Design a protein with these regions (language model features):
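Short glycine/serine- and small hydrophobic-enriched flexible loop segments
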Residues: 64-69, 118-128, 183-187, 250-254, ...
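N-terminal export signals
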Residues: 1-2, 8-28
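Alpha-helical solenoid scaffolds that mediate protein-protein interactions
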Residues: 70, 83-86, 90, 126, ...
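Short, solvent-exposed mixed-charge patches
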Residues: 347-348
Length: 348
């Protein structure tokens, strides 16, 4: 599952719409309808428009989460039906990618931990929101499979593997900190059957994140190598805070981790960046992408600053525009949900 093949970097930047003339609830409904019209095929398959219209377990997880959050039960049921039939493996986890243009749409059966977590979380939230027990059992099965297949005891820490295959490097492991969906993991730790292991996964993941501080801006990389005498950017990936790691502060904000957000806000507020994250920062030499980041990045920056300040006043609200592709639009919707739910989340 090469990281570079998961998404295409956006090469055209756009501004954050922010607060608009719409009321927050009306804008939320408009955003969801826009997202669904552009990125949800037949109300079932969520497409990555920046990557040949493939679907990921991640895109399906986000689609489920959005449908649940915006009270669209019919679309939720359709997305889940397609996801379970097209991507779910025998062990309960999900193949990470579905391609519409190949003879076998799922040639790589490996999973992606963030997709698994997002799907399990969306199902649990839907079961509670709509009082639908039919979605709780599959959520619990996925949660158990995540702990069984992806949670590894290593050097006194319980770490989350990005996928079941391909991330061991001898006596070291490659970790992707953006795959830790903190509000979901915390919810599992509060409600799941194996609360102790979820709590360990949360606490040890936050320890990894706190120590993953590289370069002049002390930021986490997209991919981290962890092991004996090894705590560094993973060798097989570029030393970037970029397309993956931008989700780290987003999920921290959603989890109400104000004390952990300061380094991101400080980095983005340097005169060089003017408050907006670059598309990527090279953590080795400080160079940045020669093209601007998307409006989704700006939405993440806005909610990060909002939650770093304690979630006071009105949360920023980003509007999906015609310039947003799937990933940028998703970051906007996720940031809006983080701003809505983050101030009420329990701190760890």
């Amino acid at each position: 599952m090469p990281a570079g093949s998961r998404r295409r970097l956006l090469k055209a930047g756009i501004g954050l719409a922010g607060l608009s003339l719409w009321s927050p609830s009306a804008l939320a409904d408009q955003n969801w309808q826009t997202f669904k019209r552009r990125f949800v095929v037949d109300d079932r398959r969520v497409i990555d428009s920046g990557n040949n219209n493939v679907s990921h377990s991640e895109s399906q997880g986000w689609g489920l989460l959005f449908a649940q959050s915006y009270d669209d039960k019919e679309t939720f049921a359709k997305i889940w039906e397609w996801t379970s039939k097209s991507l779910q493996r025998g062990d309960g986890l999900f193949s990470w990618r579905w391609s519409p243009n190949t003879a076998d749409p799922v040639p790589d059966k490996n999973n992606a931990a963030d997709g698994d977590i997002l799907i399990a979380w969306a199902l649990a939230r839907a079961a509670a929101k709509w009082n639908e027990p039919r979605w709780l059992a599959p959520s619990r099965r996925i949660q158990s499979a995540i702990l069984d297949r992806l949670a590894v005891d290593f050097q006194g820490r319980l770490i989350l593997l990005p996928g079941a295959q391909g991330f061991a490097r001898g006596n070291r492991y490659v970790v992707n900190l953006s795959y830790y969906v903190w509000p979901a993991i915390h919810d599992f730790a509060e409600r799941a059957g194996d609360q102790g292991r979820w709590r360990r996964l949360e606490a040890d993941g936050l320890w990894l994140l706190d120590n993953a501080a590289f370069g002049d801006y002390r930021l986490p990389p997209d991919w981290l190598l962890f092991g004996p005498q090894a705590f560094r950017v993973a060798d097989d990936w570029k030393p970037y805070f970029g397309f993956d790691a931008i989700r780290v502060p987003l999920y921290l904000a959603w989890h109400n981790q104000a004390s952990r957000l300061g380094r991101f806000v400080t980095a983005w507020k340097t005169p060089r960046f003017g408050g907006r994250p670059p598309a990527w920062i090279n953590l080795d030499d400080g160079s940045v992408a020669p093209y601007p980041s998307s409006g989704g990045y700006a939405a993440v920056a806005a909610v990060t600053e909002f939650m770093a300040d304690g979630g006071k006043n009105a949360a920023p609200v980003a509007e999906i525009t015609g310039d947003d592709d799937y990933y940028s639009a998703s970051l906007k919707l996720l940031s809006n949900l983080a701003g809505q739910e983050g101030p009420h989340a329990k701190r760890t």
